[in-house]
Amino acid sequence: MASALQRRPSTRIFANKNYIVKLKSEFNFKTVEARRWISKTIEQERIYNIYHPAKKWFVILSDEGGIIANMMPILEPLHITCETANSDVLIDYLSSINEHYFSIAKQYDKRLDLGLSNFAIDNTGKIFYLDDDLYQWDDFTAFGASVSHLLLKLNQFDEDT
C-alpha cells in the first residue's frame, strides 16, 4: 500500500497492512522544539477537522535531534478508488473534497492540495485529507487547474452522467 501513496522526496514512509508512518526528515529540531511544533500542529489539525482522528504525531529521538513523524491507519487513497468506483460515488467524493476545500479557504484563508492522492477514504466511506500541509490561498488559481485535471483524468463519466 505504501507504494500507492504519493510523497515528498524528504518524507520517508513505512507501512504495514494496518498503519502508515511518515518521517518528516526536512524537520530536525531539538527535542523541545519538535514537541512544540507537534503540539501546535495537533491543535491546528483538530481545528481544521479534515484529518483522520487516529492520526498521531510523535518525535523520534536521534543524535542530531528530534525527527518529527506521524502515524495513522492505512486508508484507501482516492486516486486508487477512482479506478473502480462508479461515477455517482466519485461525484459524492469530489463533493466532499470541495466542501473541505471551501471550508478551509473561507475560515482560514488557506487551501488544500486537490490532488486525488492527497485524499483517502476510511472503511465508512468518509474522506480525509492526507497531506500534512495546508497552502497559502491563491485566489482559486490552483483550484481551476485541479478541477480541469480531475475532469480530464476521470474517464468514469459517461454521457448519461
Predicted regions and their residues:
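Acidic surface patches and DE-rich sequence motifs
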Residues: F14, S62, D122
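Short, solvent-exposed secondary-structure boundary motifs
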Residues: M1-L5, Y48, Q107-R111
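Catalytic activation segment of kinase domains across protein kinase-like and atypical kinase folds
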Residues: K110-D160
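ATP-binding glycine-rich loop module of kinase domains
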Residues: M1-I42
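Conserved structural core of kinase catalytic domains
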Residues: N18, S25-F27, W37-I42, Y48-S96
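Conserved kinase catalytic-core segment
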Residues: V89-L112, L116-F119
